[in-house]
């Protein structure tokens, strides 16, 4: 528990801002994801949820945060994490699905008063209490999965500190049939929703026109749509945009997204197939080649605008 007496001159804890690899998402969130908060990324398969988190972790490492990765899918690989820019000699990797065991393993890290940590739970959907595995019937009590998630989240949120911790959660999508029409939601719905400061939905476009393939027909670039479903950072609920994930490289095409936003904001002027910025002009969006100075100027205008 944190008590701040303003009469005594005590100040609120300061947060740090960890940028995401998406220019548009940073713009909507006020620079990136804030420390001392919980952030949920959910959406369609292969929409780059884990890739996005690895890039955020890489940025956090440059700011002195140590990664703690709870890998309930047993999918973590050093090679891919390194492709995303992470220092793979630094993280603590916890692989498992039983909530009690995971909490026991990471509690010393949560209670650490000196080191800053960034936690990644990938994914929420696989975590269960020991009751599920211990009982012969699988602990099929009504709402066990939802209670398990709520128990786990409340334990973690208790250790949040604005200066020291930031938590990323990945969840799969589910179809909610409780209303008149089916809707897509993050798995475990309200239980997860109430404990999150930011909820970001990622949706992979399956349009062939928005995919790029190499000569062997392997997909080299795909467009991913994002939307902010909940945020405690700034008034940007409902804001949406897109970025491009590069599945073969383990990357996100920041430059291409920046150009798209600059064209939408008319920072780069488009006339037919020609694009103009200052005295420079290019024929076709794929031929736009920004210098370092131009890249910096456009980035500043996009983030401020």
Question: Where are the predicted features?
Answer:
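Long, well-ordered amphipathic alpha-helical subdomains in the mid-to-C-terminal portions
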Residues: 253-283
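Short, ordered loop/turn segments at secondary-structure junctions
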Residues: 72-74, 96-97, 124, 173-174, ...
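The Walker A/P-loop phosphate-binding site
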Residues: 1-91, 107-111
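Terminal-proximal interaction/regulatory segments of ATP-powered molecular machines
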Residues: 273-305
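Phosphate-binding/switch region of NTP-binding enzymes
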Residues: 142-265
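Phosphate-binding/switch loop-helix module in NTP-utilizing enzymes
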Residues: 96-165
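Catalytic P-loop NTPase motifs of RecA-like helicase/translocase cores
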Residues: 76, 127-128, 177
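A short alpha->loop->secondary-structure connector
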Residues: 62-64, 84-91, 135-144, 185-189
